[in-house]
Amino acid sequence: RDFKDVLKEAQSLGYAEADPTFDIEGIDAAHKLTILGSIAFGMPLQFDKTYTEGITKIEQQDVLYAEELGYRIKHVGISRKVKNGIEQRVHPTLIPERRLIANVDGVMNAVLVKSDAVGPTLYYGAGAGSEPTASAVVADIVDVVRALTTDPENRVPHLAFQPDALSDINILPIEEIETAYYLRMYAIDKPGVVADVTKILGDSDISIEAILQKEPAGNASCIPVIFLTQCVREKTMNGAI
């Protein structure tokens, strides 16, 4: 189905706003990720430092190619503490189809939390629609009222008692993030072209995890070629491209 038709249906059902910009460009997800990251790490993270990318650049063929390779495309927000700062990013991501979070569909949302003692835990539920939204708003109001009616000395601070809660934490720019990449390109249908591309990637120390090469459509002179890479910095990938 065409993206515009699906978006109109989502708007008619109340799952997307009349102005869908915040929904389809990842801005709403980035707002939520900033709040969740602040609570998780006990420090005030800033929304404007969150890398944000929406779903408008995804084409239907990308969904099909991902499934053929054993993945599903999900719009994911990632907040992760690493040795030199915090990764804070929202963008489409390929998730192995066997993972639970890859099977979160429709209006359902999920939050995957990885902690030291418990390991990974998944929280799953409806994330759009009038009733789920109303439920969340009422829950927030109840929390505010409880805080106001609790003696000040017994209140738990929003950022708990983290020793560096007010410190200036380093949010890594997207250029410094290391992750695997999905590349779709069109190559001339002749011997040696794919080898040339792999050499360019290899010259930048980018290792290839998988290659998917499709047959040309009709009399087309170019063929779609899909590369999955191993982890590499965004800056390195951009340089190779």
Residue spans of the language-model regions?
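Structured core elements
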Residues: K74-H75, R89, L112, L122-Y124, ...
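C-terminal transmembrane helices and immediately adjacent loops/tails
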Residues: S115, T121-Y123, D143-R146
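Adenosine-phosphate binding glycine-rich loop
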Residues: R1
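Low-complexity, glycine/alanine/valine/leucine- and proline-rich hydrophobic stretches
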Residues: H91-D116, S130-E131, G202-A220
